[in-house]
Amino acid sequence: MTVVLDTLVAVRRTAMDLLARREHGRVELTRKLRQRGAEPEMIETALDRLTEEGLLSEARYLESFVSYRARSGYGPARIREELSQRGLQRADIDLALRECGISWQSQLEDTWRRKFAGHLPIDARERAKQGRFLSYRGFSMDMISRLLSGRDMDD
């Protein structure tokens, strides 16, 4: 059964249903509503109203996304890139990453321990393997090299 989003009420209801499942950014919500056949003007009107009512919040979405991805073992560079691909503003992303309260050093150590059981690399090949994995996860090379050299992260 196809849902027809031909009224403002239907667009709003669908948007609220999506927001009830999880936080969404405006760009993502717009895309999903367009896929369901809603007119762009109705989407904008409905989303403006939801924003005014505090039901749609980019800040809440950013906070939720950063927290979720960090708990999944991803670093700030990877999270920043994913949010950029979702159409969010770079300044908003950077602010969310700064204010999230996550210790990226601790996050790096936890991710490394889960993957490599806390074993420092014994040769260049293993060091490269661990470094590639952590870099792919979005941690800076500076943080990675400090961790893999066995130096205290707070130095």
Swiss-Prot record:
GO terms for biological process: regulation of DNA repair. It comes from the Bacteria. It is found in: Cytoplasm. Gene3D superfamilies: Winged helix-like DNA-binding domain superfamily/Winged helix DNA-binding domain. Its main location: cytoplasm. Keywords: Cytoplasm. One of its GO terms (cellular component) is cytoplasm. NCBIfam families: PRK00117.2-1. Belongs to the RecX family. Modulates RecA activity. HAMAP family: RecX. This is Regulatory protein RecX.
